[in-house]
Amino acid sequence: MLNNHSMMSAIEELIDDVVANDTNATDFPDYDINDSFSHFEWAELAPVLVVYSLTFILGLVGNVIIITSTLCPRLRPLPATPTNVFLGGLATADLLLIIFCIPVKIAKLFSYTWTMGIFLCKVVHYMQSVSAICSVVTLTAMSVERYYAIVHPMRAQYTCTISQARKIVIITWITSFLLGIPMIFTQTHKQVGEKYIAYWCVRDSEAGLLWRFHEVYMLIVVLILPLSIMAFCYATICWEIWRVMKRRYHMTSRHALSPNSVDTESIPMTQRQSGNERKSRRDENDDELRTIKQVVKMLVAVVVLFAICWAPMLIDNVLTAYGCLPRLKNGTHKHLNTVFQLMAYFNRWT
C-alpha cells in the first residue's frame, strides 16, 4: 500500500488535471479508493477549494453582468460598440468554463477519482480548452480592432463596425471549437487498481508524441502567436498616440510663443470668437485623446494579466511533457504547480 505522502502526492497530481501530469495505471496496482477517502490534507485542499468557490461565485455574477451590459439590447446600459461586443464574447467564454467545469472540479477535490464516465472526462477538458482558446482569440481580435480604430481611422469606419464585430465573435467561437479538438484525444479515462477498481481522468502519457505535440500546440495557440499579434498592435498604437501628442504639443507651444502683447480689446470680436472655437476644439481633442489612452490601458492590462495567469501553467505543461520536470509533483514542485493552476482560474474573474 502507498504511504500517505506518496498517495497524497499522486492524488494532488490528479486533482490538478489541467496540467499534463499523469501516471501509468500499473504504478498503482494496490490503489484503494476507500482508503484514499480517509486522507484529507486540508492545508492543501482549503486554498484550492476557496479559489474555486470564489471563481464560481464572482465569475458567475461578474460575467453575467458584463454579458447583459454589452449584448442584451433591452438591459444594455453600455453603448453598442465593437469593443463592447468583443467584451461580451469574452465574458461568454469565461462563463462557459465556470458553469461546466468549476462544479466538476470542486467535486473532484473530495473524490480523488473520476466517477462521471469517459464522456464527461473528455467533454469537461475539451470545453476548458475551447474557453481558453476563445478568450485569447477574442483578446487578439480586440487588439486588432483597436489598431485599426486608432492607427487607420478612415479604414475603420467600414471595417470596425458592430455587425463586423458580431461576425468575428461567431467566427471566433467556431474556430475555438475546432482548435480545441486535440484535447479530446490527449485526455484519457484510465482504470487504476486491481483489487479495487477506480478511474482517473488524466493526460494520456502512453501516447508520448501526441501528448508533447498537444502541449506545444496549446503554448503556441494560446500564448505565443496571440501575444505576438497583440504586442505589435499595442506597440503601434502607443507609437501613434505618442506621435499625435508630440505634434499637438508643438502646435500648442508655437501658439503660446506667438506675440501676445497686443491688448485683447484691440482684437476684433470675430477673431476672439475664432480663438474660442479653436480652444473648444482643442479641449474636445484632448478629451478624446484621454479616452483613447484609457481604453488602450484597459485592454493592455487585460492582455498582460492573461499572459501572467496562463504562461506559467502552459510552460510547465511543456516542460513536464518533455521530461524536464517530474510528472509526479512533490514538495516545492507540487505547490508551484497548484499556484500555476489557481492563477489560470484567477484570470476568469479578473
Model-derived regions, located:
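Generic alpha-helical transmembrane segments of integral inner-membrane proteins
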Residues: 50-53, 57, 61-64, 99, ...
